[in-house]
């Protein structure tokens, strides 16, 4: 059974649009997800206390072993991630969680200007 991490954009937000997009994408990807073991992580809130990143917890282990990771729905991308911390609180300690993610239905708040090195 494949292990899949879903970064759930509907956890920790009152934006109904995030929930609608997520549900639609899950329906469209049911052929892929139905036979998988899923673990959900939030994109809008911290997933674990900082101390948990230094321990080998089941959640951390699952993330390392996941066959693939999906981020589905909402406007997460930005030229400057530090300015959108309430939308997607990524820091250096947990940024590895998002390595090699597949994004579907993810928009951007791109405006004029350069993409910061931190955002890359």
Go through each PLM region and give its residues.
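Aromatic- and Gly/Pro-rich donor/ligand-binding loops
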Residues: 2-120
């Amino acid at each position: 059974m494949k292990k899949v991490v879903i970064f759930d954009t509907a956890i920790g937000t009152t934006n109904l649009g995030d929930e609608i997009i997520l549900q639609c994408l899950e329906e469209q990807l049911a052929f892929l997800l139905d036979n998988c073991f899923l673990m959900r992580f939030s994109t809008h809130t911290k997933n674990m206390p900082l101390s948990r990143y230094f321990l080998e917890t089941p959640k951390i282990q699952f993330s390392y072993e996941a066959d693939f990771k999906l981020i589905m729905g909402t406007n997460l991308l930005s030229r400057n991630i530090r300015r959108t911390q309430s939308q997607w609180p990524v820091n250096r300690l947990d940024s590895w969680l998002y390595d090699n993610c597949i994004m579907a239905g993810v928009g951007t708040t791109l405006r004029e200007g350069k993409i910061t090195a931190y955002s890359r």
